[in-house]
Amino acid sequence: MVNITIDNHTIAVPSGTTIMEAAASIHIPIPKLCYLKDINEIGACRVCVVEIEGQDHLVTSCNNVVEEGMTIYTNSPKVRRNRKHTVEMILSQHDAQCATCVRSGNCTLQTVANDLNIVDSPYKKEICIEEWDTRYPLVRDASKCVKCMRCIQVCDKIQGMHIWDVSGTGARTTVGVSENRDIKTADCALCGQCITHCPTGALRERDDTDKLYRALEDKDTIVVAQIAPAVRAAWGESLGLSREEATVEKIVDALRRIGVDYVFDTTFSADLTIMEEGTEFVERFTNGDLDMYPMFTSCCPGWVRFIKSQYPQMVNRLSSAKSPQEMFGAVMKTAFAKKMNIDPDRIFALSIMPCVAKKDEREKPLFHGEFAGHGVDCVLTTRELDRLIRADHIDPKTLKDAAFDTPFTEGTGAGVIFGATGGVMEAALRSAYYLITGKNPEVDAFKQIRGVNKNGWTEAQFEIAGNTINIAVVSGLQNTRNLMEAIQKREVHYHFVEV
């Protein structure tokens, strides 16, 4: 243990602990902008500087470890002056039109500036302006970039895609698509991790709420919405709702108040996907098609984009099943339209999805022209849903639990677990078990595949009616790349893989 003093608090912490971690252990928060634990600990923003007694210069707390006998000041006059000056300099290169920014109220830079009582920027504004095709599902605004490098590190270390890179030096430093490529040709999987970890509004998904409003304004248009299983676990946070309050039934109420005509649960089409994937797996397994290479799930459009760009020779190993989103879109404009005696051309199919890649999936030619245009007409992410509710002046606390519309309400429960890693695999295996044996498996028969282990993927072996089935579940594109390489080198062998 190392004995130190932080802001007059004497504590002992393990060797190797950073100053920031030591301060956090006694509930002393240190402002930070670029820090991302274990991923981006480069001290680039210098907002987290602290003063160490006996040293003339300030040090970054995120990447400097404690030493025996250190006396540290996290908010001394010298630290406050330096920190405020640093943030003022950052703001001089930042388009601070917060009122029109999607991250207003949820922006790290905005929070830090407010906490430091910065009410004016004394330096001349020098804002970087770069062109970007805002029709693309992923939108980058260079004028809001603070060069924190989070997007680069997340894309490199977690996803292994290397889409973003830094160029220039000093004040001319900028972040952009690596190798000066256009984002549309850069093999981006549209996983959205760079958006999630961006501390400002420099990265965001394309906002499609206006498309929905235009449909709602058309009296001849029937707006039909579906809500993905994963959304119910993530929505409402920015609206101040607790996990217990943010039920999926309240989303139904919100959408109806906004003017949506019918609201369905994508769990229904997740069941359709599972039946197709389970049936396809049994058929391919029985035919010996999986003896060398596995069948891969096809629900995640980010993963589908990844395999098409990185491992095109393995595309034929994907399940032929559409994603639940696209299956529901097809159902809406065929079975639902027929049942309700509605012209499919009048149906506007809306999807509430957790992922920006779903916007790209909707636009694929594969899902166009089968009936009334695209199967899905508009995709809103969870963040857009929250903004939509605020824009309609709906008080989240007044939302009530409302039931989904019929007839596509009933589900087996298999679709609900799609929102968890391993959920698709577990549901597919349960279906395969029933298709092979004619019996339902035990409730926890496949529970060991839930989650991902420290090696990046979970593997398991099951016996079904005398057949040995090897499966794997992986999350994260870098982990997926490692798994794909191992499969191609014959280091591992699986019959079925969920990504």
Predicted features along the sequence, with ranges:
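Eukaryote-biased recognition of intrinsically disordered, low-complexity regulatory segments
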Residues: M1-H9
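Aromatic-flanked redox-active Cys/Sec active sites in thiol-based oxidoreductases
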Residues: N8, L36, D141-A142, T185, ...
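Iron-sulfur-associated redox domains of electron-transfer enzymes in respiratory
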Residues: S15-G69, N75, V79, E205-V499
